[in-house]
Amino acid sequence: MSNSRPAHARKAEIVAEIVSKIKSAQGVAIAEYKHLTVAKMTELRVQALKQNIDIKVYKDSLVRRAVEELGLVDLIPFLTQQNVFIFSNEDSISAAKLVANFAKKNEALKLKAGIYEGKVVDTAGINEVASLPSKEELYSMFASSLLYPLRKVMAAINAVAETRN
């Protein structure tokens, strides 16, 4: 990438990229990574890549411009320290879930806030989002609930068959 363009033009491009990423993402999580080692950040990036989640580090001042443009000004108080921005493109909870699970094993990563269903959520809110079941878990719960009546019928049939023998 050439640095021949003026700095304000490069910054405007980055702000436009951030706006685009936030608009297209199903969910966004913000985490502080101040004391996270390069190896651990690489591990987080690898896990994110496997789940089709984008991880980016942007200057907070550029993110501030983007969220102001989007009307998400409630996010501004969380834009301090060294932040990593996690964009989930497939569902609204996988970004929060990825960071929350990674943060449990790596205290240097702190989940701070996020955007869920177009609204800014604070630390407690994003942790609550992270605790929601994933799409796969919901499918499993649904399938299990569909099979429950069938299991009861089969158990009743087996009980009747055993009493006749």
UniProtKB/Swiss-Prot annotation:
SUPFAM superfamilies: Ribosomal protein L10-like. One of its GO terms (cellular component) is ribosome. CDD domains: Ribosomal_L10 (cd05797). It comes from the Bacteria. Pfam families: Ribosomal_L10 (PF00466). Keywords: Ribonucleoprotein, Ribosomal protein, RNA-binding, rRNA-binding. One of its GO terms (biological process) is translation. The keyword rRNA-binding applies. Part of the ribosomal stalk of the 50S ribosomal subunit. The N-terminus interacts with L11 and the large rRNA to form the base of the stalk. The C-terminus forms an elongated spine to which L12 dimers bind in a sequential fashion forming a multimeric L10(L12)X complex. NCBIfam families: PRK00099.1-1. Belongs to the universal ribosomal protein uL10 family. This is Large ribosomal subunit protein uL10. The lineage of its organism: Bacteria, Bacillati, Mycoplasmatota, Mollicutes, Mycoplasmataceae. The gene is rplJ.
